[in-house]
Structures are given as C-alpha cells and as structure tokens.
Amino acid sequence: MIQKTVLTNGVRILTESMPQMVSSTIGVWVENGSRYEEGPENGVSHFIEHVLFKGTKKRTAAQIAEQVDAVGGVLNAFTGKEYTCYYAKVLGEDLKMTIELLADIFLESVFAPDEIDRERQVVLQEISQAEDTPDDFIHDLFNLHFWQGHPLALPIFGSVETVNHIDRTMLLALMEHRYRANRVFIAAAGAVDHADLVRDCERLFGGITGNGSYAPVTAPDEHLVVLNHAKKLEQAHLCLGGRGVSQVDPLRYAAYVFNTALGGGMSSRLFQEVREKRGRVYSIYSFLSAFLDCGYFGIYAGTSPEWVDEVLEVTLKEIHEVIRHGLKAAELARAKSQLKGNMLLGMESTDSRMNRLARNEIYFGREIPLEEIARGIEAVTNDQVVDLAASCFNPQRMGMVMLGDLKGRELGADVFSALG
C-alpha cells in the first residue's frame, strides 16, 4: 500500500508498506543536484553529501557509522544531477532510530573546518578514481562535449579546480538556499507504518521552513562533436549518442523498447552482432540518460584499438537497419516482455521500491502504477520505434567520444553519414 502525507511546512512523506518484509529502506531526498550549480560551484552538492556524515552536534563521524553498523544496517548517500538522497536499510524494528539518525545528519551537521579539508582529499581521490576508470570516465567526457556550456554537461563530482575552491561558506550557503521544505521529502518502503513515520517526521523535520531558490533551468542544446581523447590504455572506449527523451516524455515507452532491443541485454542486436558473432568487444550496450526536460540516447563499447572502425561500422549499421525496417515482430514482443519482467523483478527489493517512490515523486508528483507502465510498454508500435530511432540518431545532432591510445585515427562528423 502506497501512502503520501504533506506536513504543514511542505515536507512530503511517502511510504510503501510491504508486510511480508522484515527490512525497510528509507531515504531523505532533496531535489538538488549538480544541474542547479553555477560553474564555480560545480561539485558543491556532492561535497555536501560527503560532509554531512562527518559529525553533528550530537554525534561524531565514528558514532554515526557505529550506530547503523550495530544493528546490521547500511547507511549511505548519493548525488545525482537533479537530486540527492541520504538513505539507510535496516530491520523494521530499527526504523525509528534510523530516521532520527538521518534527521540529525540532515539538519544538525556542524561542518567542522578540519573535516571539510579532510573530506576534500577524499573527493579528490574519488575524482582521480573515476578518471582512472575509463568505462565511467568516457560518459563524463561525452556529457561535457555533447551538452557543452550547460550545467548538465558538468561532472557530479566537480573538477579538481572547483573542489579545491569549495569552502565552508559555499557549503552552508547552498544548504541555506536549497535544502528547504518545498524541496525535501522522505520515502520509505518495506516494514514501515505510515502513521508512525509521519509522526516521527513531523517531530524531526517539521521545523524546516522556506522555499528552495534556484536559477531558472533550461534544456541544453546538443553539439555535433567527434572527439578523440588520448589516454594510454589497453582498450579503446567509445560513447556515442543523440537527442533522447525526458523522464516525462510521452515517447519514453517507445524509447524503453528501442533501447532494450538495440543494446539492453544479451539478446539485443548490438550484443549479438558485435560480441557474439564477431567477438570484438567484452562490453557493449545502449542506454537512456533522461532528466526533467531533456535526455540523450547513448551507446557504449570497449574494444581493441584495431577494431574500433569495425565496431563503429556494425553499430551504425544496426541503428540504420532499425530506422529503415523497424524491429522484427519477435524482437518487438521480446523487448516488451523483457521490460515488464525486469520491472516486476525489481519490485522484490525494498531499495528499488523506495527509489521508485522517490523518482515518481520528483518527475511526476504522483505514483505511477505498474499497470500504467505495462500498458504504455505494450502500446508501443513499430512505427513509433522507427520514428524515435530516426529522431535520436539524426547525424546532424549526434556526438561521439573515443578514449584510448588511438594515435593517427582522426574521425570527423561524416562518421555518422552511414545513418543517411
């Protein structure tokens, strides 16, 4: 059973009670992420996520960690481009203690200067680790160039330069302006009683006031770009893509189906053609990167430098085949069944249900029933897939980044000419 209550100050409480579960996953969400940062602020939202675990007026950083470990729970957080979440997974009997701990972290952190300086080094190590992980780093590179000049282009972690300039004043200013009642909600799934949680949240979060202030957001423009980023690696990594759909676009169901058929599993076109038939990659997949008002449809592959041209040629050929002929009837049916099956399997976890509650609240402001999603998937036609493929992979609005030791290989925008 899903329930929602809005406190008098505007903080929202969402729960999904799962009586069969003994565990609960609970998150304190704030609708703030790297998208809402100005250039010099890049990385400040993620930095706050780190610092909130470094001590409150009541607890040291060690005591925060010990309190959840003592009951066998998990305490963590993550920052996205449009939201940040502080969450825990515990037994249902420990939920009251956990929400009190999360509230203490969220509302009473002290931002000690020595902890800020220490955590800065941790964040810088996180940036270095990401840059040393090419199959992650290439996605940041693609964003940076495809959406250049827009906040969505910037990495969530920030850069070495911006992180080194973040100080206590910046952190507190962002908290003051954006961690406000109208941007905060609590989501919980599993062994949770809605009325009990509302009472606890009224006591703990009822004092938050005000409305979060943000500069107006606009959708980014796509930039036709083909970039070879030199880095000494054993493999070459490719990321290419074009304009996609937003989280709320009516065509999102067609995008789900196309993505699944093209590169969303072992039976997908790209996996079968590039890996299984040719053995040219270990990893290849397509993906959707979607936000409030925009998105892109991307493809990633990692291969040996001498096989880059072949992998790219086969990938573009498969896209072109869908644009020209659509999906086979069996492919279309299989993609729909795969999507619906994956959706139902995901419902077995309190983590995924809590995240689903939260994302529906952020993007739709309401619960999206599984039946509604299933109907949307089932209603997708081949014509919709063809139109979407042609729109997403328009050669005039595409980008590609290659990462690796690719000396002497220079590709121009005409690389996409195979798409027509």
Question: What is each of the regions a protein language model found here?
Answer:
Residues M1-V11:
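Short, Gly/Pro- and small/polar-rich lid/capping loops
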Residues G39, K58, A195, R199, ...:
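Double-stranded RNA-binding/processing signature
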